[in-house]
Amino acid sequence: MWSRKSAMLGSMAVAMYLLGLTLRNSQLVTIAVVIFVFLTWAALFGGHADVASSGRRAEEWTGEEGVALGSVLAMRKLSGSRIFEDGELTVTLRMQNNSGLAKILEVRDRVPEVMRIKEGSNYILMELGPRRETYIEYTLECPLRGFYSIGPVAVRVQDPFGLFHKEKEMHVYNDFLVFPKMEDLKDTFVKSRVPKIFTGAVNIRQPGPGSEFYSLREYFEGDSFRAINWSAYARSGKLMVNERERDAVSDVIIIIDSRAVSETGPVSRNALVYSTRAAASLAKYFLGRRDSVGVVVYGDEVVSVDRDTGKKQLYVILTKLAGAVARGNIPLQVVVNRILPHINKGSPIIFLSNLEDDPTIVNALRDFRARDFDVTVLTPSSLEFEFDAKRLDRTGYEVMKTERDVLIGELRGLGVNIMDWEPDMLLSTALAGARGF
């Protein structure tokens, strides 16, 4: 590819050649021919013509293997593969020149558009000596959840005279996952007494798996040796085992609306962003109380995470939430009809939605209430996001706000605990308001 310098030289040579022919000046023609010869030599033998591109994804590398661009090698390392929103990711790009000649390189590492470079730079223009290497290090700030990939590496190799260059993309990629950030609900819940609503693991005064001591009994074949009470054995001369008081674990179902309408508003401030963060925070809280948590995300399809407990369940839920995309328009009634037969009676239901463009919401939540489910609805208002971004005028806002208030009042009349979640309101505040605290 011609650079600006080579284009100017070429244009000048053409002008001198034509002028020499017109004036019959052999000196101008000779100079023009010399320039043409020099440009031809630089283009063919200037040291940049060994460019070739091939590569593999980063997870296929072994050892110090990278992706080669002729005699130039690129390798990339990330400080982590899983981070939370607003977290930082350090990227180190290693460039090597394995040839015996110096290379003038222009390197740009492609990063996702939503990422912000907080420190350093993903671009460098340098002369890399023969059999030398250099490192490009920069820090990304990751404001939004999702699956992301860094790459490819765009490289421009110039000849020593700066006349020509060739550009190629080195197909080296690194994938990473950004989880939705979570709000710590532990202290806030205790202050607002919300945990009384969601009871968590409760002792029911029956023997079984649990943490609290229940009674002593004689050892039977098959009992765990860890359960043997050696002090009781020393006193009685019989093998005795400890029985624990069985814990009853509540099932909590979290439903997230990820239809196309949930992305109404700015990219970083919309109903889906708030809903995924709330779902992550609630899942962490309930799993910390040894509850069994299940998640349902619906948009163009219904994606569910079966109820389970423990840290592994939290990771599964966070991964599903990170991959939630706003698309489709499945009605809530379809979701309720599908999951209703599989939910234990009395399970708390938490529904996260902006309540827009779905005429089945009232009937769907009525079905839950008719079966005596405890339903809590947190509804991030897309109207507020649009109005704050000045995409909605005052008159339109007031009309749509009135319609929304009527819908919320109708749901309250069904016995649904509901809160209009304003953009600057903490999750703990919104949840306490929904529960009437």
Which residues are covered by each model-predicted region?
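Exposed, interaction-prone extracellular/peripheral surfaces
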Residues: 4-7, 189, 198, 207, ...
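An extended acidic
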Residues: 1-64
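An amphipathic, basic-hydrophobic helix/alpha-beta surface used to engage anionic
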Residues: 36-308, 348-351, 367
